Amino acid sequence: AIHHGNMAFVIASALSHHTLNDSGIYHMGFGNGGSDVLSTGAIKYKSTNTSSTKDSSADLYNRTYKKVVAKPSATTSVQSGDPSNNIEVIASTGAYTDLKVKCLLDFGEPTGQDATDSATTDTSYVFDELGLFAYYQDTTTGTIDIEQSLMLSHVIFHPVQKSTNRQIEIIYTIRV
């Protein structure tokens, strides 16, 4: 689900061309707090943390990993991400444009994951939620501060374990 309040703020910031912070999608966050597995084996999904007003505290229920999806230009201080991750702008003949966000979690990442996909309990890398987050750079130190970035979307899904023997590719499309 789109966090309409935060998304509207980021779009307005990007259109103003006077700000670097909150001016576009920067990273994808992953978490394991979006659902509960009941003793019966049934899965209870939580509501998304989205609203129609700007909320700088909106976040995943339990963010455990993040991956940069933005590709920096030569004139920005944005950290370089994985070359297989990117954001593509797809124009249409209609009154909309799509943003296609690709994110690959490769075999060796994240560090500390289980060797095989056989977990029977919730671990840091059994993901059941993800979100897109805006860019944020501390204006005093110049460092990128992902903890201060605005969450732009929040999706909750069936738990999926990321383990060393598995790649996970996410293709996330936002229509504007």
What positions do the PLM features span?
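Small cysteine-rich, disulfide-bonded extracellular modules of the LU/uPAR three-finger superfamily
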Residues: A1-F127, Y135-V176
